[in-house]
Amino acid sequence: MKAYLKSAEGFFVLNKSTTIGRHENSDLVLQSPDIDNHHALIEYNEAECSFVLQDFNSRNGTFVNECHIQNVAVKLIPGDILRFGSAGLTYELVIENPPPVSFPWMRGPAPWPGPQPPRATQQPNQAPPPSHIPFHQGVQPAPMQRSWSQAFPRPTVVLPASHRRPVSANKEMFSFVVDDARKPPVIKQVWTNAMKLSEKSVAEGIPGAVPPAEIYVEEDLAQQDKDEIILLLGKEVSRLSDYEIESKYKDVIIANLQNEVAELSQKVSETTTSRQNEKEISQKCQVLDEDIDAKQKEIQSLKSQISALQKGYSKVLCQTLSERNSEITSLKNEGENLKRDNAITSGMVSSLQKDILAKDEQVQQLKEEVSHLKSQNKDKDHQLEALGSRCSVLKEELKQEDAHRELREAQEKELKLCKTQIQDMEKEMKKLRAELRKSCTEQSVISRTLREKSKVEEKLQEDSRRKLLQLQEMGNRESVIKINLERAVGQLEHFRSQVIKATYGRAKPFRDKPVTDQQLIEKITQVTEDNINFQQKKWTLQKETQLSNSKQEETTENIEKLRTSLDSCQACMKISCCSHDLKKEVDLLQHLQVSPPVSGLQKVVLDVLRHALSWLEEVEQLLRDLGILPSSPNKDQVQQFSGNSAVFTAGKAAGASGREGEAERGEARARGEAQSQNQATDGREGGKALEEYITQERNRAKETLEEERKRMQELESLLAQQKKALAKSITQEKNRVKEALEEEQTRVQELEERLARQKEVLESSIAHEKRKAKEALESEKRKVQDLENHLTQQKEISESNIAYEKRKAKEAMEKEKKKVQDLENRLTKQKEELELKEQKEDVLNNKLSDALAMVEETQKTKATESLKAESLALKLNETLAELETTKTKMIMVEERLILQQKMVKALQDEQESQRHGFEEEIMEYKEQIKQHAQTIVSLEEKLQKVTQHHKKIEGEIATLKDNDPAPKEERPQDPLVAPMTESSAKDMAYEHLIDDLLAAQKEILSQQEVIMKLRKDLTEAHSRMSDLRGELNEKQKMELEQNVVLVQQQSKELSVLKEKMAQMSSLVEKKDRELKALEEALRASQEKHRLQLNTEKEQKPRKKTQTCDTSVQIEPVHTEAFSSSQEQQSFSDLGVRCKGSRHEEVIQRQKKALSELRARIKELEKARSPDHKDHQNESFLDLKNLRMENNVQKILLDAKPDLPTLSRIEILAPQNGLCNARFGSAMEKSGKMDVAEALELSEKLYLDMSKTLGSLMNIKNMSGHVSMKYLSRQEREKVNQLRQRDLDLVFDKITQLKNQLGRKEELLRGYEKDVEQLRRSKVSIEMYQSQVAKLEDDIYKEAEEKALLKEALERMEHQLCQEKRINRAIRQQKVGTRKASLKMDQEREMLRKETSSKSSQSLLHSKPSGKY
C-alpha cells in the first residue's frame, strides 16, 4: 500500500518509517527554523493497516488538521492535512488503494449540531478507548495524553473554517454553545483539553473537568457588551490554564520520582545479588580455613618426623629442611594474613549490609512520601474541581452582587492557600531530590569500595594459587630433573660453544681468558636489542610518514576548498552587493565538507557572512520601500543619486519659473490698475502723482522679490550643506563599520589560527608521549621476550622430559579451566586425580630410588658439572635481578602514563576554557555588529525624514511665493504703509515657519517612538482579539449579523428622516422667498412714500428715521433663515443703511457672530455618531435663532438710541407671531419627539452597558446609574462627572488585566527558556557520559595488558625458582647418597604434601568460578 505526502512543491513517497526534521540523515529534510533536528516520525502499523504520526516533543509541535500536537502519537487517515512547525508547508496524506477499514470515530455525531439536549455535551467523553499504537524504539508516549484523532470523533462532513481551533489557543479548545429556545440566549463556557484527557476520566465522566458555567445574556445586547463578555471569559480561561500548567508540572515531577524509585529498586536488587555472592565467598573462606587447619596439622606431623630424621642427616639436609621450614612459616603467615583479610572483609560486608538496610528503609520512606504527595495532588485536583464548580455558581449568580463578592474573596483566599501549599510541596520535592542524590552518591561510594575489596581478594587468591602451583611443580621436577641432568650438562656445553661461535665468529675473542656466560649473554642481548630497535624504528617511521602525509593532504585540500569559496565570496562582495548572489555563495560555503580543524573556521566565516547578508537584505528592503529597485546596486545607486539631483534641479527650475510668472502677473495687474486709474482720472488733476506712486511700488516689489530669491538661495545652500554633511557622516559610519568588520574578521582568523596551532601542538605532544610510552612498553616486552627465549633455550636442553612435563601441566590447566564451569564435576574429577597421583607417587618413588643409585656411582665424574650448575645459578640470580629492575621500570612507566593522562585532562580543560572565552568574544563582536547595523538603519531613516521635511519646507515656501502679490487695499487713504506691513509680515511668517519646522522635527522624532510603541500594543491587541474572534461560534456570528442588519435599518430610517428634513428645509426656503417678495413690496411702498414726502421739506428727517426703523424692524424676519449667505446679506444691508453712528462696531459684531457660527458648525460636523444627529440639528437651529435674535436686538439698541421704541415693538410683534405660527407647529413636534426618543434609547443602552461592565469587572463604585431626563443643568453636570469617574475606573481595571496578562506571558517565556536550557544540558550530559564510557574502556584495556605482563613476569620467576630448587636437589643427592632410605621416606612425605596442596589449589580455583 503506497502512501504520499502531497504539497505545493510535489509528492513525497512514504516508507514504512519516515523521519522528518532538519537533520541531513532524516528522510524528509525541512530547512526551516521552526523545525527541530529530529521533529517527527510517520510509521506504518501493519496490524491496523494505517499510518501513525509520532511527535518527538518538538519545540513548536506539529499540526494535524490545524490541531496542535506535541509529544503524542496520532493515527492518520487519507485526506489529513499535516504541518510541521508553526509556519511552513502543508502536506496532505494520499494513500493508493486504501483498505476497507471502518473507522469508529467516523460514526460519531457531527461537531456542530443543532439544538440538542443537555446530555449531548457528554457524548464525546463516552468514546471508546484508543487502540494500541506501536511507538518508535526509544520513544515512549506520555502517560496522561491522548491523540487528537482518537480523543474526539471525526465528522464525515468537512468542517467550516470558523470551527477550527486558532493557533494561539495553546493546546486548549474553547467554545460557546447558544441554545436556540425562546428563552434568553445562554452562553455556555466549555473547556476541553485534547492532550490531557485520560482513559480513566473518560470512563468515570471526567471528574477532573470543570463543569460548564452559564451566563444569561439579553437579546438586545450591543456588540461591545458581547466583546467585553468574550474578553472576560478569555481571562477566566487563562486563569484556569495556569492551574492546568501547574498540574502538568506536578505530573512531570511525579513521573521523575517514579523513575528514580524504579532505579533505586534496581539498585536494591543488585545489592541482594551482591549479598548472595558475599555469602558464597564466606562459605568458601570457611572451607579454606578448614584446609589450612588440616595443612597445619600435617605440617606439625612433618616437623616431628623431620626432627627425628635430623639426627642422622648431614649439614646439606639440615639446610634444605631449614629452607623448607622457612617456606612453611611464610605460608603460615600468609594463611594468617588471609584469615585477617577475610575477617576484615566479613566486617566490611556486614557494615555494608547494615548501610544497605538503612538505605532500603530510606527508599521505603521516600516511596511513602511519594504516595503521600500523590494523595495530596489528588486532593488538590479535587480542590480545583471544587473551584471550577464555585466559578460556575458565581457565573450563575451574577445578579446577586453581594454573594458574588463573598465567593470571590473566598476563592482568592483558597487560591493563596493553594499557592502556598504548592510552594511548600515544591520545597519538599527539592529536599527529597537532594536526599535521593545523596543516597545515590553514597551507594556509588559503597559499590566502589566493594569492587576494590573484591579485587584485593582476587589478588590474594591468585597469589595463593601461584604459590601452590610452585610447590607442585617443584616436587614433580625434582624427581624428573635428577635423571636427565647428565644429558643437560653435555648439551649445555655444546650449545654454549655453538653460541660463542655464532656471536664472536671462528676467531677467539680472548686468547688468554675464557668467555664467561655473562659476557655471552650481554653480547646476545645487545645484538637482539639493536635488531629489534632498528625494525621498530623503521616501522614507526613508516607509519608516522603515512599518517602525516594523509593528514597534510586532507588539510591542504580543505584549505584550498575554503580559500576558493572565500575568494568567490570576496569577489561577490567587491563586484556587487546583491543579497541573492551572496546567499548562493553562503549556501555553497555551508555545503562544503571540511575536516574538523578547518570546520571551526568555516563556521565562523559563515556566521560573519550571514550577518552581512542579513544587513544587506535589510538595506535592500529599505531601498524597495523607498521605491528603488536593488537589482544592480552600483548602477541603481548612481541612478538614484542622479534622479535625486535631477528632481532637485527640476524643483529649482520650477520655483524660478513660478517666481518669474508671479512677477509678470503682478506687473500685469499693476499695469491694468494703472490703465484703469488713468482712464478714470483723465479729467482729474492727480494723475502724475499716482504714476510716481505706482513706479515706487513696483521698485519695492522688485526689491522684495530679489531679497526673497536671495533667501531662497541661502536656504537651498544650507539644505545642500546639510545633505552633504549627512552623506559624509553616513559614509564615515559605513567605513567605520566596514573597518570594524574587517578587524573582527582578522581577530576571528587569528583566534582560529591560535586554536589550530594549539590543537596541533597538543596532538603532537600527545602523539609523542604515546609513542614514547609505546616504545618503552615494547622495549620492555622485547626484553621479557629475550629472557623467555633464553630460558626456553635452556629448557630445550632438558629435551623430551621437560616437554612431557609441560604437556602434563597444560592438560592440568585445561582440566582446571573445565572444572571452573561446573563445581560438582570438578569435585569428582579432583578425587579421581588424587587417586591417580597416589599411583604416580609410588612410581616416582621407585624411579627416585634408582636415580639415587645411579647418582652415587657418578658423583666423582660429575664434580665439574656441579661447578657449572653453580655458575648457571648465579646467572639465574642475575636474570632475576634484571626482572626486578624491569618490574620497577614497569611501575615507573605506569606512573608516567597516569601523569600523562592527568596532563591531557588538564590540557583539555584549558582548551575548553579557551573555547568558551573565544565563543564569548565572538558573541560580543556579533552584538557590536548588530548595534552598528541598527545605528546605520536609524541614520538612514533620519535622512529620509530630513529630506521629507526639506521637501515640505520647499513646498510651503513655494506656496508663500505664490501668495506674494497680495491685493492692494481699496482705501486710498494710506498707500505707503501697506507694502511695508506686508513685507514685514512675510518675514515674520518665514521665521515662524522655520521655528515651526525645527519644533516639528523634534516632535516627529518623539512621536515616532510613541507610534512604534503604540503599534506594538496594537499588534498585541489585534492578536488577542483575533484569538478571541477565532473562538466565537456560528450562533454568535448570526447574532452579530442580526445586529448589523438592525444598524442598517436604523441608517435607512435616518436617511428617511434626513429626506424629511430636506423637505422641511425646502418649505422654509419657499416661505423665505415669499418674505422676500413682501419685503420688495414694502420697499416699493416706501419709495412711493419718499416721493410723496420729498415735496414736504420740513418732514425729511422724520421720514428718514421711519425708513430706517422699518428696515431695521423687517430685518429679524430675514435673519431667521437657515442659510448663512442670507444672514450676511441682511447684515450688509443694515450696514449700508445705518452708515451713521457706530458703523464699525456693528461690522465687528457681525464678524464675531459669523466666526462663532462657523466654529460651532465645524464642531457639530466632527461628531459622527448617528444617535446624536437629531439632537445636533435641534441645537443648531436653537443656536441660530438665539444668535440672530440677540444680534438684531443689539443692532437695534446700538444703531440709534434716539429712535422711538413703539414702532419697533409694533413691527416685531407681528413678525414673531408669524415665525411662531409657521415654524413652531412643524419643526418642534417632529424634531423634539425624535430627539427625546433617541435620548431615551441612548440612556437605556448606557445604563445597561455600565451595569453589565460593573458586574463583570467587580467594580463596586459605579455611581452614574441615573437617567438625565428630568434633571436640571447642575444635576446633569454632577451625573456627567460621575459617569466620567466610572469610565476611569473601567479603564484602570482593563489596564490592570493587561498588566497581569503581560506578566503571565513573561513567565511563560521564562519557562520556555528553562526548558531549552534543560534540553541543551541533557545533550551535553549524554556527550560527557559517552566520553566517560570510552575512557573507562581504555582504562580497562590497559589494566588487562598490565595484568598479562605481570602474569608473564610471575611465570618467569616461577620457572627460575624451579631451576634453583632443581640445583639444590642435585646438591642434596650428591651429599646424601649414604642415607637413601631415609630420603625416600622424606620424598614420600613431600608427595603427600603435594597432593594436599593440589586439593587446596582445586578449591582455590573453584572460588573465582563462583564469582564469574
Swiss-Prot record:
SMART domains for this protein: FHA
Ranges of compositional bias, category Low complexity: 1397-1412
Alphabetical keyword list: Cell projection, Cilium, Coiled coil, Flagellum
Every FHA domain range: 18-69
CDD domains recorded: FHA_FHAD1
Location of this chain's protein in the cell: Cell projection, Cilium, Flagellum
Keyword Coiled coil: yes
Positions with biased composition (Basic and acidic residues): 659-672, 955-973, 1086-1099, 1382-1396
Region (Disordered): 106-133, 652-688, 955-976, 1086-1110, 1372-1412
Tissues with expression: Testis (at protein level).
Subcellular location, principal: other
UniProt-listed InterPro entries: CC-FHA_domain (IPR052642), FHA_dom (IPR000253), SMAD_FHA_dom_sf (IPR008984)
GO terms under cellular component: sperm flagellum
Superkingdom of origin organism: Eukaryota
Coiled coil (residue ranges): 250-466, 692-963, 999-1099, 1141-1169, 1292-1360
Role noted for this protein: Regulator of sperm motility and spermatocyte meiosis.
Protein name (Swiss-Prot/TrEMBL): Forkhead-associated domain-containing protein 1
Organism name: Homo sapiens (Human)
